[in-house]
Amino acid sequence: MTLDGKKPRARRTLPFSFFGRVKAGLKQSPGLAAKRTAHRVADPARQVVDYFVSERRTVRQGFVAVSVAATTSLIAGLTLAGMSGRMEAIRGLFVLIPVSIGMRGNIFGALAARLGTSVHTGLFEVSRDKQGILYQNVYAAALHTLATSAVMGVMARAIAGLLGIRTVSLWDFVVIALVGGVLSSAIVLALTVYLSVESFRRGWDLDSVGAPLITAIGDVVTLPCLLLATYLAGLGLVTPILGGVALAAGCASLAHGYTTGNTFARRLVRESFPVLCVAIVLDVLAGAVVQPRADDILHKWPAITIVVPGFLEITGALGGILAARLGSKLHLGVVSARARPDAIVLLDASILLVLGVTVYALISSATLALAELLNQAHPGALRFLGLVMFGGLLATVVAAVIGYYAAAATYRLHLDPDNQTIPLVTSGMDLLGAICLVLALVVFGVA
Protein backbone atom coordinates (compact mmCIF):
# COMPACT_ATOMS: atom_id res chain seq x y z
CA MET A 1 0.00 0.00 0.00
CA THR A 2 1.15 3.57 -0.70
CA LEU A 3 0.86 6.49 1.77
CA ASP A 4 -2.46 7.59 0.25
CA GLY A 5 -3.97 4.10 0.79
CA LYS A 6 -3.87 3.02 -2.84
CA LYS A 7 -2.39 -0.16 -4.21
CA PRO A 8 0.88 0.34 -6.09
CA ARG A 9 0.52 -0.23 -9.79
CA ALA A 10 2.07 -3.52 -10.92
CA ARG A 11 5.06 -3.08 -13.16
CA ARG A 12 4.60 -4.45 -16.68
CA THR A 13 7.32 -6.98 -17.35
CA LEU A 14 6.19 -8.78 -20.49
CA PRO A 15 8.32 -8.09 -23.55
CA PHE A 16 6.40 -6.78 -26.55
CA SER A 17 3.87 -5.16 -24.15
CA PHE A 18 5.17 -1.65 -24.70
CA PHE A 19 2.46 -0.58 -27.16
CA GLY A 20 0.33 0.94 -24.38
CA ARG A 21 3.24 3.18 -23.41
CA VAL A 22 3.67 4.14 -27.06
CA LYS A 23 0.00 5.10 -27.32
CA ALA A 24 0.17 7.15 -24.11
CA GLY A 25 3.37 8.78 -25.21
CA LEU A 26 1.90 9.88 -28.52
CA LYS A 27 -0.63 12.00 -26.65
CA GLN A 28 2.25 14.19 -25.50
CA SER A 29 4.50 16.33 -27.65
CA PRO A 30 6.51 14.42 -30.32
CA GLY A 31 9.81 15.05 -28.56
CA LEU A 32 8.48 13.96 -25.17
CA ALA A 33 6.77 10.94 -26.74
CA ALA A 34 10.01 9.80 -28.35
CA LYS A 35 11.87 10.29 -25.08
CA ARG A 36 9.35 8.29 -23.03
CA THR A 37 8.95 5.39 -25.44
CA ALA A 38 12.47 4.90 -26.79
CA HIS A 39 13.65 2.80 -23.87
CA ARG A 40 10.48 0.69 -24.02
CA VAL A 41 10.83 0.07 -27.75
CA ALA A 42 14.41 -1.10 -27.30
CA ASP A 43 13.48 -3.36 -24.39
CA PRO A 44 12.11 -6.35 -26.39
CA ALA A 45 15.20 -6.49 -28.58
CA ARG A 46 17.42 -6.46 -25.49
CA GLN A 47 15.41 -9.23 -23.89
CA VAL A 48 15.60 -11.35 -27.03
CA VAL A 49 19.38 -10.88 -27.19
CA ASP A 50 19.75 -11.66 -23.48
CA TYR A 51 17.62 -14.78 -23.87
CA PHE A 52 19.67 -15.95 -26.84
CA VAL A 53 22.84 -15.46 -24.79
CA SER A 54 21.41 -17.43 -21.85
CA GLU A 55 20.20 -20.17 -24.21
CA ARG A 56 23.23 -20.12 -26.51
CA ARG A 57 24.05 -23.76 -25.82
CA THR A 58 20.52 -24.84 -26.70
CA VAL A 59 20.48 -22.60 -29.79
CA ARG A 60 23.80 -24.03 -30.93
CA GLN A 61 22.69 -27.62 -30.40
CA GLY A 62 19.36 -26.97 -32.12
CA PHE A 63 21.06 -25.31 -35.08
CA VAL A 64 23.52 -28.17 -35.50
CA ALA A 65 20.74 -30.76 -35.24
CA VAL A 66 18.43 -29.00 -37.71
CA SER A 67 21.33 -28.35 -40.11
CA VAL A 68 22.28 -32.04 -40.03
CA ALA A 69 18.62 -32.88 -40.64
CA ALA A 70 18.47 -30.48 -43.59
CA THR A 71 21.64 -31.90 -45.11
CA THR A 72 20.63 -35.53 -44.72
CA SER A 73 17.20 -34.74 -46.16
CA LEU A 74 18.93 -34.22 -49.50
CA ILE A 75 19.63 -37.97 -49.49
CA ALA A 76 15.91 -38.58 -49.00
CA GLY A 77 15.16 -36.09 -51.77
CA LEU A 78 17.50 -37.84 -54.19
CA THR A 79 15.92 -41.17 -53.23
CA LEU A 80 12.47 -39.73 -53.90
CA ALA A 81 13.58 -38.35 -57.26
CA GLY A 82 14.98 -41.77 -58.12
CA MET A 83 11.66 -43.44 -57.24
CA SER A 84 9.82 -41.87 -60.16
CA GLY A 85 9.68 -45.20 -61.98
CA ARG A 86 8.14 -47.02 -59.01
CA MET A 87 5.70 -44.16 -58.41
CA GLU A 88 4.47 -44.59 -61.97
CA ALA A 89 4.20 -48.38 -61.52
CA ILE A 90 2.47 -48.19 -58.09
CA ARG A 91 -0.42 -45.79 -58.65
CA GLY A 92 -1.04 -43.41 -55.76
CA LEU A 93 2.22 -44.26 -53.97
CA PHE A 94 2.89 -40.60 -53.14
CA VAL A 95 -0.19 -40.61 -50.90
CA LEU A 96 1.60 -43.15 -48.71
CA ILE A 97 5.00 -41.41 -48.63
CA PRO A 98 4.33 -38.50 -46.20
CA VAL A 99 2.43 -40.70 -43.76
CA SER A 100 5.12 -43.41 -43.83
CA ILE A 101 7.84 -40.85 -43.14
CA GLY A 102 5.67 -38.91 -40.70
CA MET A 103 4.85 -41.89 -38.50
CA ARG A 104 8.53 -42.48 -37.80
CA GLY A 105 8.83 -38.91 -36.56
CA ASN A 106 5.52 -39.09 -34.69
CA ILE A 107 6.27 -42.29 -32.81
CA PHE A 108 9.97 -41.85 -32.18
CA GLY A 109 9.95 -38.06 -31.90
CA ALA A 110 7.38 -38.44 -29.11
CA LEU A 111 9.56 -41.20 -27.62
CA ALA A 112 12.55 -38.84 -27.53
CA ALA A 113 10.39 -36.05 -26.07
CA ARG A 114 9.20 -38.31 -23.24
CA LEU A 115 12.73 -39.45 -22.52
CA GLY A 116 13.88 -35.82 -22.62
CA THR A 117 11.24 -34.91 -20.05
CA SER A 118 12.36 -37.81 -17.84
CA VAL A 119 15.93 -36.50 -18.06
CA HIS A 120 14.82 -33.00 -17.01
CA THR A 121 12.80 -34.39 -14.09
CA GLY A 122 15.58 -36.76 -12.96
CA LEU A 123 13.68 -39.99 -13.68
CA PHE A 124 15.77 -41.26 -16.60
CA GLU A 125 18.24 -44.09 -16.10
CA VAL A 126 20.03 -46.43 -18.47
CA SER A 127 18.60 -49.81 -17.49
CA ARG A 128 17.09 -52.98 -18.96
CA ASP A 129 14.60 -53.21 -16.11
CA LYS A 130 11.16 -53.99 -17.56
CA GLN A 131 9.60 -51.53 -15.12
CA GLY A 132 12.06 -48.79 -16.06
CA ILE A 133 11.23 -45.67 -18.07
CA LEU A 134 13.46 -46.65 -21.00
CA TYR A 135 12.14 -50.20 -21.46
CA GLN A 136 8.46 -49.28 -21.17
CA ASN A 137 8.81 -46.43 -23.68
CA VAL A 138 10.55 -48.70 -26.19
CA TYR A 139 7.92 -51.42 -25.68
CA ALA A 140 5.06 -48.98 -26.34
CA ALA A 141 6.83 -47.61 -29.45
CA ALA A 142 7.11 -51.14 -30.90
CA LEU A 143 3.38 -51.76 -30.37
CA HIS A 144 2.55 -48.39 -31.93
CA THR A 145 4.63 -49.24 -35.01
CA LEU A 146 2.73 -52.43 -35.82
CA ALA A 147 -0.72 -51.01 -35.05
CA THR A 148 -0.30 -47.73 -36.93
CA SER A 149 1.31 -49.35 -39.99
CA ALA A 150 -1.83 -51.42 -40.58
CA VAL A 151 -4.06 -48.37 -40.06
CA MET A 152 -1.89 -46.32 -42.45
CA GLY A 153 -2.50 -48.68 -45.36
CA VAL A 154 -6.26 -48.79 -44.79
CA MET A 155 -6.66 -45.02 -44.26
CA ALA A 156 -4.43 -44.08 -47.21
CA ARG A 157 -6.44 -46.29 -49.57
CA ALA A 158 -9.78 -45.07 -48.18
CA ILE A 159 -8.97 -41.34 -48.30
CA ALA A 160 -7.41 -41.60 -51.76
CA GLY A 161 -10.57 -43.33 -52.99
CA LEU A 162 -12.80 -40.64 -51.47
CA LEU A 163 -10.75 -37.91 -53.16
CA GLY A 164 -10.87 -39.68 -56.53
CA ILE A 165 -7.15 -40.51 -56.64
CA ARG A 166 -6.44 -43.72 -58.53
CA THR A 167 -4.34 -46.17 -56.52
CA VAL A 168 -3.35 -49.83 -56.33
CA SER A 169 -5.41 -52.25 -54.21
CA LEU A 170 -5.99 -52.07 -50.46
CA TRP A 171 -3.82 -55.16 -49.86
CA ASP A 172 -0.95 -53.57 -51.77
CA PHE A 173 -1.13 -50.46 -49.58
CA VAL A 174 -1.32 -52.47 -46.34
CA VAL A 175 1.68 -54.64 -47.26
CA ILE A 176 3.79 -51.65 -48.36
CA ALA A 177 2.89 -49.68 -45.22
CA LEU A 178 3.57 -52.48 -42.73
CA VAL A 179 6.71 -53.98 -44.27
CA GLY A 180 8.24 -50.57 -44.96
CA GLY A 181 7.21 -49.38 -41.49
CA VAL A 182 8.67 -52.34 -39.61
CA LEU A 183 11.99 -52.25 -41.50
CA SER A 184 12.50 -48.52 -41.01
CA SER A 185 11.23 -48.50 -37.41
CA ALA A 186 13.76 -51.11 -36.32
CA ILE A 187 16.58 -48.80 -37.43
CA VAL A 188 15.02 -45.57 -36.14
CA LEU A 189 14.20 -47.14 -32.76
CA ALA A 190 17.78 -48.28 -32.23
CA LEU A 191 19.16 -44.86 -33.14
CA THR A 192 16.59 -43.06 -30.97
CA VAL A 193 17.57 -45.08 -27.91
CA TYR A 194 21.25 -44.50 -28.66
CA LEU A 195 20.68 -40.74 -29.06
CA SER A 196 18.71 -40.59 -25.79
CA VAL A 197 21.39 -42.43 -23.82
CA GLU A 198 24.19 -40.30 -25.28
CA SER A 199 22.24 -37.10 -24.60
CA PHE A 200 21.83 -38.19 -20.98
CA ARG A 201 25.51 -39.03 -20.57
CA ARG A 202 26.90 -35.99 -22.40
CA GLY A 203 24.42 -33.42 -21.09
CA TRP A 204 22.86 -32.59 -24.47
CA ASP A 205 19.44 -30.93 -24.60
CA LEU A 206 17.35 -33.80 -26.01
CA ASP A 207 14.39 -31.46 -26.59
CA SER A 208 16.49 -29.47 -29.08
CA VAL A 209 18.37 -32.28 -30.84
CA GLY A 210 15.85 -35.14 -30.66
CA ALA A 211 13.06 -34.00 -33.00
CA PRO A 212 15.23 -32.83 -35.96
CA LEU A 213 17.71 -35.72 -35.85
CA ILE A 214 15.06 -38.41 -35.48
CA THR A 215 13.02 -36.84 -38.26
CA ALA A 216 16.13 -36.79 -40.47
CA ILE A 217 16.92 -40.42 -39.69
CA GLY A 218 13.31 -41.34 -40.44
CA ASP A 219 13.44 -39.58 -43.81
CA VAL A 220 16.69 -41.21 -44.89
CA VAL A 221 15.72 -44.70 -43.73
CA THR A 222 12.01 -44.84 -44.56
CA LEU A 223 12.09 -44.11 -48.30
CA PRO A 224 14.53 -46.94 -49.19
CA CYS A 225 12.54 -49.33 -46.96
CA LEU A 226 9.31 -48.21 -48.60
CA LEU A 227 10.90 -48.71 -52.02
CA LEU A 228 11.87 -52.28 -51.09
CA ALA A 229 8.35 -52.95 -49.79
CA THR A 230 6.78 -51.92 -53.12
CA TYR A 231 8.22 -55.05 -54.71
CA LEU A 232 5.83 -57.13 -52.57
CA ALA A 233 2.85 -55.42 -54.24
CA GLY A 234 0.98 -56.96 -57.15
CA LEU A 235 2.13 -60.56 -56.58
CA GLY A 236 -1.20 -62.26 -57.25
CA LEU A 237 -2.40 -64.31 -54.25
CA VAL A 238 0.76 -63.61 -52.25
CA THR A 239 -0.01 -59.93 -51.67
CA PRO A 240 -3.57 -60.46 -50.27
CA ILE A 241 -2.26 -63.18 -47.93
CA LEU A 242 0.55 -60.90 -46.71
CA GLY A 243 -1.98 -58.09 -46.34
CA GLY A 244 -4.24 -60.26 -44.20
CA VAL A 245 -1.33 -61.24 -41.98
CA ALA A 246 -0.32 -57.58 -41.69
CA LEU A 247 -3.82 -56.52 -40.62
CA ALA A 248 -3.98 -59.35 -38.08
CA ALA A 249 -0.59 -58.35 -36.65
CA GLY A 250 -1.69 -54.73 -36.35
CA CYS A 251 -4.95 -55.63 -34.59
CA ALA A 252 -3.17 -58.05 -32.23
CA SER A 253 -0.58 -55.39 -31.30
CA LEU A 254 -3.29 -52.84 -30.58
CA ALA A 255 -5.30 -55.28 -28.45
CA HIS A 256 -2.18 -56.27 -26.52
CA GLY A 257 -1.25 -52.64 -25.95
CA TYR A 258 -4.68 -51.84 -24.51
CA THR A 259 -4.65 -54.84 -22.15
CA THR A 260 -0.98 -55.36 -21.24
CA GLY A 261 -0.08 -55.66 -17.57
CA ASN A 262 2.70 -53.13 -18.12
CA THR A 263 0.91 -50.12 -16.62
CA PHE A 264 3.02 -47.34 -18.10
CA ALA A 265 3.09 -48.88 -21.60
CA ARG A 266 -0.68 -49.45 -21.46
CA ARG A 267 -1.26 -45.79 -20.61
CA LEU A 268 1.00 -44.69 -23.46
CA VAL A 269 -0.85 -46.84 -26.00
CA ARG A 270 -4.27 -45.71 -24.80
CA GLU A 271 -3.29 -42.04 -24.80
CA SER A 272 -1.25 -42.00 -28.00
CA PHE A 273 -3.02 -44.32 -30.43
CA PRO A 274 -6.11 -42.11 -31.00
CA VAL A 275 -3.83 -39.11 -31.56
CA LEU A 276 -1.67 -41.12 -33.98
CA CYS A 277 -4.82 -41.99 -35.95
CA VAL A 278 -5.58 -38.28 -36.30
CA ALA A 279 -1.96 -37.76 -37.34
CA ILE A 280 -2.32 -40.49 -39.99
CA VAL A 281 -5.30 -38.69 -41.52
CA LEU A 282 -3.36 -35.39 -41.62
CA ASP A 283 -0.32 -37.03 -43.23
CA VAL A 284 -2.43 -38.85 -45.82
CA LEU A 285 -4.09 -35.55 -46.71
CA ALA A 286 -0.61 -34.02 -47.10
CA GLY A 287 0.22 -36.74 -49.63
CA ALA A 288 -3.12 -36.19 -51.35
CA VAL A 289 -2.30 -32.47 -51.71
CA VAL A 290 0.97 -33.25 -53.51
CA GLN A 291 -0.11 -36.35 -55.50
CA PRO A 292 -2.09 -34.49 -58.23
CA ARG A 293 0.95 -32.25 -58.83
CA ALA A 294 3.50 -35.05 -58.82
CA ASP A 295 3.22 -35.71 -62.54
CA ASP A 296 3.01 -32.09 -63.69
CA ILE A 297 5.50 -30.29 -61.42
CA LEU A 298 7.72 -32.78 -59.62
CA HIS A 299 8.58 -34.72 -62.76
CA LYS A 300 9.08 -31.50 -64.74
CA TRP A 301 11.31 -29.90 -62.07
CA PRO A 302 13.30 -32.65 -60.27
CA ALA A 303 14.94 -30.01 -58.05
CA ILE A 304 11.56 -29.40 -56.41
CA THR A 305 11.20 -33.15 -55.86
CA ILE A 306 14.58 -33.17 -54.09
CA VAL A 307 13.59 -30.36 -51.73
CA VAL A 308 10.15 -31.76 -50.76
CA PRO A 309 11.30 -34.20 -48.01
CA GLY A 310 13.62 -31.62 -46.46
CA PHE A 311 10.99 -28.88 -46.63
CA LEU A 312 8.39 -30.94 -44.80
CA GLU A 313 10.99 -32.40 -42.45
CA ILE A 314 12.34 -29.03 -41.31
CA THR A 315 8.87 -27.62 -40.74
CA GLY A 316 7.88 -30.55 -38.56
CA ALA A 317 11.24 -30.54 -36.77
CA LEU A 318 11.02 -26.83 -35.90
CA GLY A 319 7.52 -27.29 -34.56
CA GLY A 320 8.72 -30.37 -32.70
CA ILE A 321 11.56 -28.42 -31.05
CA LEU A 322 9.15 -25.79 -29.71
CA ALA A 323 6.57 -28.39 -28.68
CA ALA A 324 9.18 -30.50 -26.86
CA ARG A 325 10.64 -27.47 -25.04
CA LEU A 326 7.19 -26.30 -24.00
CA GLY A 327 6.22 -29.82 -22.94
CA SER A 328 9.17 -29.94 -20.55
CA LYS A 329 8.46 -26.41 -19.26
CA LEU A 330 4.78 -27.21 -18.69
CA HIS A 331 5.81 -30.24 -16.62
CA LEU A 332 8.21 -28.09 -14.60
CA GLY A 333 5.69 -25.26 -14.14
CA VAL A 334 7.85 -22.69 -15.93
CA VAL A 335 5.16 -21.97 -18.56
CA SER A 336 1.43 -21.46 -18.03
CA ALA A 337 -1.04 -23.06 -20.45
CA ARG A 338 -3.24 -20.12 -21.42
CA ALA A 339 -4.59 -18.39 -24.52
CA ARG A 340 -2.10 -15.51 -24.33
CA PRO A 341 1.44 -16.95 -24.45
CA ASP A 342 3.85 -16.15 -21.65
CA ALA A 343 6.87 -13.98 -22.39
CA ILE A 344 9.19 -16.98 -22.39
CA VAL A 345 7.06 -18.63 -25.10
CA LEU A 346 7.57 -15.62 -27.36
CA LEU A 347 11.28 -15.78 -26.70
CA ASP A 348 11.34 -19.48 -27.57
CA ALA A 349 9.41 -18.65 -30.75
CA SER A 350 12.09 -16.11 -31.68
CA ILE A 351 14.68 -18.91 -31.49
CA LEU A 352 12.45 -20.94 -33.81
CA LEU A 353 12.22 -18.09 -36.32
CA VAL A 354 15.99 -17.58 -36.45
CA LEU A 355 16.55 -21.32 -36.90
CA GLY A 356 13.91 -21.39 -39.64
CA VAL A 357 15.42 -18.52 -41.64
CA THR A 358 18.91 -20.00 -41.39
CA VAL A 359 18.03 -23.59 -42.19
CA TYR A 360 15.64 -22.87 -45.06
CA ALA A 361 18.32 -20.69 -46.63
CA LEU A 362 20.76 -23.57 -46.19
CA ILE A 363 18.54 -26.26 -47.69
CA SER A 364 17.39 -24.12 -50.63
CA SER A 365 20.98 -23.21 -51.52
CA ALA A 366 22.24 -26.78 -51.05
CA THR A 367 19.42 -28.22 -53.16
CA LEU A 368 20.05 -25.71 -55.93
CA ALA A 369 23.78 -26.50 -55.92
CA LEU A 370 23.05 -30.23 -55.98
CA ALA A 371 20.58 -29.79 -58.83
CA GLU A 372 23.16 -27.87 -60.85
CA LEU A 373 25.82 -30.48 -60.10
CA LEU A 374 23.58 -33.38 -61.16
CA ASN A 375 22.05 -31.48 -64.07
CA GLN A 376 18.53 -31.60 -62.60
CA ALA A 377 16.01 -29.13 -63.98
CA HIS A 378 14.72 -26.27 -61.81
CA PRO A 379 12.50 -23.22 -62.51
CA GLY A 380 15.38 -20.72 -62.26
CA ALA A 381 17.78 -20.00 -59.40
CA LEU A 382 16.10 -16.88 -57.96
CA ARG A 383 12.61 -18.28 -58.37
CA PHE A 384 13.60 -21.56 -56.73
CA LEU A 385 15.31 -19.86 -53.78
CA GLY A 386 12.40 -17.44 -53.40
CA LEU A 387 9.67 -20.06 -53.35
CA VAL A 388 11.49 -22.27 -50.82
CA MET A 389 12.22 -19.33 -48.49
CA PHE A 390 8.70 -17.90 -48.80
CA GLY A 391 7.03 -21.23 -48.16
CA GLY A 392 9.49 -22.06 -45.37
CA LEU A 393 9.00 -18.82 -43.45
CA LEU A 394 5.24 -19.13 -43.77
CA ALA A 395 5.39 -22.70 -42.50
CA THR A 396 7.70 -21.73 -39.60
CA VAL A 397 5.22 -19.15 -38.32
CA VAL A 398 2.41 -21.69 -38.55
CA ALA A 399 4.58 -24.29 -36.76
CA ALA A 400 5.19 -21.90 -33.86
CA VAL A 401 1.48 -21.21 -33.43
CA ILE A 402 0.49 -24.88 -33.70
CA GLY A 403 3.31 -26.00 -31.40
CA TYR A 404 2.29 -23.69 -28.57
CA TYR A 405 -1.47 -24.13 -28.67
CA ALA A 406 -1.25 -27.90 -29.12
CA ALA A 407 1.01 -28.15 -26.05
CA ALA A 408 -1.19 -25.79 -24.03
CA ALA A 409 -4.45 -27.53 -24.99
CA THR A 410 -3.22 -31.03 -24.19
CA TYR A 411 -1.81 -29.82 -20.87
CA ARG A 412 -5.06 -28.10 -19.87
CA LEU A 413 -6.93 -31.31 -20.67
CA HIS A 414 -4.58 -33.10 -18.23
CA LEU A 415 -2.98 -35.14 -21.00
CA ASP A 416 0.73 -35.64 -21.53
CA PRO A 417 2.05 -33.00 -23.99
CA ASP A 418 4.87 -35.35 -25.00
CA ASN A 419 2.37 -38.02 -26.14
CA GLN A 420 -0.11 -35.76 -27.92
CA THR A 421 1.75 -32.63 -28.98
CA ILE A 422 4.61 -34.11 -31.02
CA PRO A 423 2.40 -36.27 -33.30
CA LEU A 424 -0.16 -33.50 -33.82
CA VAL A 425 2.46 -30.84 -34.53
CA THR A 426 4.53 -33.05 -36.84
CA SER A 427 1.57 -34.36 -38.85
CA GLY A 428 -0.26 -31.06 -38.79
CA MET A 429 2.86 -29.41 -40.18
CA ASP A 430 3.20 -32.10 -42.84
CA LEU A 431 -0.24 -31.08 -44.12
CA LEU A 432 0.19 -27.34 -43.57
CA GLY A 433 3.77 -27.48 -44.84
CA ALA A 434 2.56 -29.13 -48.04
CA ILE A 435 -0.09 -26.42 -48.39
CA CYS A 436 2.53 -23.69 -47.78
CA LEU A 437 4.79 -25.24 -50.42
CA VAL A 438 1.96 -25.47 -52.95
CA LEU A 439 1.00 -21.86 -52.14
CA ALA A 440 4.61 -20.80 -52.73
CA LEU A 441 4.60 -22.63 -56.08
CA VAL A 442 1.47 -20.71 -57.07
CA VAL A 443 2.78 -17.32 -55.84
CA PHE A 444 6.03 -17.74 -57.80
CA GLY A 445 4.23 -18.92 -60.93
CA VAL A 446 5.56 -22.48 -60.93
CA ALA A 447 2.23 -24.26 -60.35
Model feature map: region roles:
Residues 156-182, 234-241, 255-268, 293, ...:
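Membrane-interfacial helix-loop-helix connectors in multipass membrane proteins
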Residues 269-339:
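Transmembrane helical segments that form the transport core of multi-pass membrane transport proteins
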Residues 110-129, 190-212, 264, 298, ...:
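Juxtamembrane helix-loop transition segments at the membrane interface in multi-pass membrane proteins
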Residues 111-164, 318-373:
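Helix-loop-helix junctions within the multi-pass membrane cores of secondary transporters/permeases
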Residues 61-80, 151, 278-287:
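The first (N-terminal) embedded transmembrane alpha-helix
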Residues 176-188, 237-250, 395-396:
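Structural signature of hydrophobic alpha-helical transmembrane segments
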Residues 66-67, 94-106, 138, 142, ...:
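Transmembrane helix-bundle signature of multi-pass membrane transporters/permeases
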Residues 19-56, 112-137, 250-265, 323-346:
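Non-transmembrane, extramembrane segments of multi-pass ion/lipid transporters
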